[in-house]
Amino acid sequence: MQQLNPSEISEIIKGRIDNLDVSSQARNEGTVVSVSDGIVRIHGLADVMYGEMIEFPGGVYGMALNLEQDSVGAVILGAYDTLAEGMSAKCTGRILEVPVGKELLGRVVDALGNPIDGKGPLGNTQTDAVEKVAPGVIWRKSVDQPVQTGYKSVDAMIPVGRGQRELIIGDRQIGKTAMAIDAIINQKNSGIFCVYVAVGQKRSTVANIVRKLEETGALANTIVVVASASESAALQFLAPYAGCTMGEFFRDRGEDALIVYDDLSKQAVAYRQISLLLRRPPGREAYPGDVFYLHSRLLERASRVSEEYVEKFTNGAVTGKTGSLTALPIIETQAGDVSAFVPTNVISITDGQIFLESAMFNSGIRPAVNAGVSVSRVGGAAQTKIIKKLSGGIRTALAQYRELAAFAQFASDLDEATRKQLEHGQRVTELMKQKQYAPMSIADMALSLYAAERGFLIDVEVSKIGSFEQALIAFFNRDHAELMAKINVKGDFNDEIDAGLKAGIEKFKATQTW
């Protein structure tokens, strides 16, 4: 019997392999290896893109987020109870898109743009990619037009401009959403379209917000995007991007839009959940390493774009108009800790923050804006002229009052100047209080600020400041309607308006009707 030589066998095998004619072909169909917690691992998808839609049997879709050497990790968008190991998975060659357009105004949709308000299907909408690159520096324009929130404390001290990103930050149940909703209500007649993105909120809370927007007539101007607390982490992670794409539709066509993200803390938690399930390495507070990029790529899309950008985007259909998308992201802190990971990230990305304080809220100062810590980095250039002129001393008065009030608790005998500063500060603090769902016009705000700035409140009791302000505004809107209309339209401050306001307030104070 002839003995086989191992080296000969290996040579024969090598020769056979070399002569084998196999054309390498990329496969765009794979097999589901595992399904758990909304995460699917797929083997055999050779040419899948990051963020690509993957189709499963039964019309279920997923999104590829982990591209590994031997498998692909994808999140399922929606229910995944029909999926099982061994099922096929196909590449679609498309990234996720959502409906955009004016047909969405007045509607409530989910994170994928499907209507959930029972008003029937959407009209003829076009679709656009959820993930888009923000406009470059060359295409941007500086912020120089205001977004009136209707809050005295914000518009006077922390003004917001069109194309700005202004963070609203504070503990839970402190009025963050109330402030954002009032800002949306105030845009009813301003020509600014609004998008409200609810992430991880209770459905009952969102239903109340939608009802309030409908009652005030602001819903017709607003798109509501909802990824409630009962929905998957994938949809909560995607909702802000979907809302941003809907807002960009207006910006890119030379319109102005305002978007509220309520809130990005819950989006970060949803993204952390997805990342940990995908077995990505955790970092600080168990968040993944790219949680900064999660928010920066979203908030950089809020911008003011130039006439050239709009003209190029619309192929010359719209000329001579700038577009803007203003963002009001909301972040929830734990016990006022603004130095936590996500709050510090978003503070560094945005153009300023409105800090709401629990102690002020509990002492009855609502909105509970802490003027000392709050700042608007670019809004000053966009502030209405009359508000800018009259609000100069307001922030100083409040800062001095807070400092002196703490000092005055220990000192028994105060000098005249200190006592006057304290009294003025008390009245300004009282004047900054405002009821929910009652945004003010520019003229009403200017009138209140003028009364405080020119010392007309000094002889009014602190407890009666609120009723004095209401009666004063009612008096001016009745007897000086022409002056108020002029302020609302032009927003200028000159000697004529100064004299008109002064004479009107003196006449009102003589009546003693508050």
Swiss-Prot record:
Subcellular location: Cell inner membrane
Residues the entry annotates as binding ATP: 170-177
Site-annotated residues for Required for activity: 374
Superkingdom of origin organism: Bacteria
GO cellular component, one term: plasma membrane
EC code(s) of this entry: 7.1.2.2
Task of the protein: Produces ATP from ADP in the presence of a proton gradient across the membrane. The alpha chain is a regulatory subunit.
This protein's name: ATP synthase subunit alpha
Originating organism: Pseudomonas putida (strain ATCC 700007 / DSM 6899 / JCM 31910 / BCRC 17059 / LMG 24140 / F1)
